[in-house]
Each structure stands twice: as C-alpha cells, then as structure tokens.
UniProtKB/Swiss-Prot annotation:
GO terms for molecular function: chloride transmembrane transporter activity; monoatomic ion channel activity. The keyword Membrane applies. This is Putative ion-transport protein YfeO. GO terms for cellular component: plasma membrane. Pfam families: Voltage_CLC (PF00654).
C-alpha cells in the first residue's frame, strides 16, 4: 500500500510524537515550577517581611544569593550541572543523564531568581539527553544523531508554540539528495515539532507579538531604514560578542564556581537596580510590559536595552545555565522602540522587527530563526518582503565575524 519511503517515515512517526510531547512536558513543568518559585521569591517573601520587591537591597541580595546557590549546584552536583551554555551551541550531542538533575535545578533557580537568560539551552540539553537515554533502549535501531534531531525539533516547537521555526531551521541542515528528498528527512522532525507545539498550546500560549501599529505598504525608503536599524542592532550585538569571551576568561580565572557566580549575581543585581525590574528574568513577559507602558521614552528604552545587553553578557560569562535568544528579543524590541521614539517617521513595526532580526542574527547566526522571531513579534504579512530584503545586508555584515560564544579554558 505504502512506498518503502513512506513506511520508513511512518516508522519514525511514533518516536517523533513521543519525543515531541515529552519535550513540551519537560519545558512546561520546568517553567511552571520556576514561575511558582519566582512568585514566592519576588512577591510573597518580600511582602511578608515588609520589603518592596523592587528595592535595591532586595534586587542585589536576591541575585547575589541566586548566583551563590547556582554556583554551589554547579560545583557539587554530579556532572557539574551540564555544559556551560557560553561555550556549547544550542544543539549538541547528548550529555550524561547524571548531569540533568543539577542542570534542571540550576535552570529553575536562575529563572526564578531573576537572571537575564532564557530556558532554551538547558531545556534543549535536557530533552536531547533524555531522548537519547530512553530512546536508545526502546528503539535501538535509531541512532543518537536521530534522537538529537527529534528532541531538538520537539523542543523548538514547544518553545515557540509552532512547528514553523523547526521546519525553517532544519530545512537548511537536513538537505535532501537524489535518493532521499528533503521533505522525507523533515517528516519526523516536523512531526516532533508539531507534537511539541500542540502540547504546549494545551497548557499556555507563548505571547511574542507586541501591540504595534499595522504596517500598511512597503516603500523604498523603508528598506533603507530597516537596513540601518538592523545595522545598528548588529553593532550593539557585536559589542557583546567582543565582551563575552574576554569577561568569561577573566571570571573563570577564579576557578571556583561559587565565587564566580556569586560575583556575577552581584553585578546582575547592580544592573537590575539601574534598569529596574523590567531588565530581570528571561524577558518575554517584561517585553510585553515595556510595549504596553505609556510612560517610557527614548531614554528609558535605551537604558533598558543597554542594561539588558550588559546583563546578558554578565550572566552568560558567569556560567549561569540559560539561553540567549529570549533576552536578545527583548533587547531588540527595546532598541527598536527607542529608534522609533527618536525618529517617529520610521514606523515602529520596521524599527522593532528589524532590530530584533539584527540582534537574534548576532546571537544565533541563523537567518531563518532571526526572520521567524522578527515576524512573530511583529506579526504583519506586509513586513515579510521587507524583512527578507533587510536580511541580505545584515548577513553580509556578519559574514566571517566571530560568534557570541566564549572560548574553552583548560581546567
């Protein structure tokens, strides 16, 4: 009835569905626990002792304590809470399962404590390791690489609430051939991503889109404006690219994770006092608050973008377990709103989307993911042709440039 190619795809469907659902459940459970813990640390606990949650004392103290606790976990837990996200790429080969409890605990405490990183890197590491560990026993004929692809696709679908991002990302890595078309290779990852996104949607809907005025019609001047905005965002991102490896090397000369992360948490607390509560945490909810605010001006947006960028570099250089995509989206949104406030003739839809495109491109060096994030934050079909055109000079600017990553150090 089915061609052998179709039977092969159907055989992978069940593992893909299981991995997609499981990847989403790991993300949902982690985020729920972190959210409950965050409410306790930043609302109930300070209220019970009569301290404002946004007071300098509480912000500095909480982030310093968060750094110390995460440092203790990294130093003493088996596997040292997994790989350092500042060194490893988002998608990598499976780590030892023994490192996962420490990694999950470090992630939850970091998210709840206000560290300016997202959940994507640790969740990806956890899901890949679990998929490889359990999948190799249940389906021994499937290789570790296939489990890595399925788990990463399911996680991407769960993180962004749609399988589109996974389809775009893997379309450039799972290339087809004369014998096996690209869509044959994409079938199982796309099914895992769809299962992950649908499972996530049953529990909550990620809110990426901002209330920005509709973009009516593309003009030639808008293309030039968008390219300039993207270039400004790339320039800001390249400052982080220059700082991260140097700061990472400087901090890790101390050798002691408790000391390194304690210092990192203290600096994050100082930055939190300067930027305010909006610059804390992973950035998605704070981005919504920033966009809905009626009191922020160009100077405020600049402060938010600069502080969040500095916090991203400090958190990554210190070794906190977290990802950099969500904070980059916040920085891009703040930068775009600032540029629109300075030059109101350029629509906010252009400044925000192109700034996000530039920042995410610096962080991920992935054109499809950058286009996707810009399009979901400013969901306007009239912008898509402009974003595709703006991507071209942005990609040229970054060709051959170093990545936002630290160098490995000898122990």
């Amino acid at each position: 009835m089915f061609h052998p190619r179709a039977r092969t795809m159907l055989l992978l469907s069940l593992p893909a569905l299981i991995i997609g659902v499981a990847s989403s459940l790991v993300l949902i459970a982690s985020m729920k626990v972190a959210s409950v813990f965050q409410q306790f640390l930043w609302q109930r606990l300070p209220a019970s002792i009569g301290i404002a949650y946004d007071s300098p004392f509480w912000i500095v103290g909480m982030l310093t304590l968060t750094g110390i606790v995460v440092g203790l976990i990294i130093r003493y837990s088996p596997g040292h809470a997994g790989p350092d996200p500042a060194i490893e790429p988002l998608i990598s080969m499976p780590v030892s399962p023994s490192a996962l409890p420490g990694l999950l605990l470090a992630l939850i405490i970091g998210l709840a404590g206000g560290v300016s990183l997202g959940p994507e890197h640790p969740i990806m590491t956890i899901n890949i390791a679990l998929a490889a560990a359990f999948g190799s026993r249940l389906f021994p004929r499937i290789t570790a690489l296939d489990w890595t692809i399925l788990a990463s696709a399911g996680t991407i679908g769960a993180l962004f609430g749609t399988p589109v991002a996974a389809a775009l990302i893997f379309s450039q890595t799972l290339s087809g051939s004369n014998d096996i078309p690209m869509w044959d290779r994409l079938f199982a990852p796309l099914m895992a991503a769809a299962a992950g996104s649908l499972t996530t949607s049953l529990f909550f809907h990620p809110h990426f889109s901002l209330p920005i005025a509709h973009y009516t019609q593309m003009r030639l001047v808008d293309i030039a404006s968008g390219a300039i905005v993207a270039a400004i965002a790339i320039a800001a991102g390249m400052v982080a690219v220059w700082c991260l490896p140097r700061l990472h090397e400087l901090l890790h000369r101390l050798k002691n994770p408790v000391l390194i992360l304690g210092i990192g948490g203290f600096i994050l607390g100082i930055l939190g006092v300067i930027g305010g509560p909006l610059t804390l945490f992973k950035g998605l909810d704070e981005m919504q608050q920033m966009a809905f605010s009626q009191t922020l001006g160009a100077g405020d947006y600049f402060t938010l973008a600069a502080v969040k960028l500095a916090a991203l570099v400090i958190a990554a250089a210190s070794g906190f377990r977290g990802g950099r995509i969500f904070p980059a989206v916040f920085i891009g949104a703040a930068l775009g709103l600032m540029l629109h406030a300075h030059v109101e003739a350029v629509p906010a839809a252009i400044t925000v989307s192109c700034a996000i495109l530039g920042l995410v491109l610096v962080v991920t060096r992935d054109g499809w993911l950058s286009l996707f994030m810009a399009a979901v934050v400013v969901p306007d079909t009239n912008l898509l042709p402009l974003l595709c055109i703006v991507m071209l000079p942005a990609w040229l600017l970054l060709a051959g440039k170093p990545l936002l990553a630290a160098n490995r150090h000898e122990p």
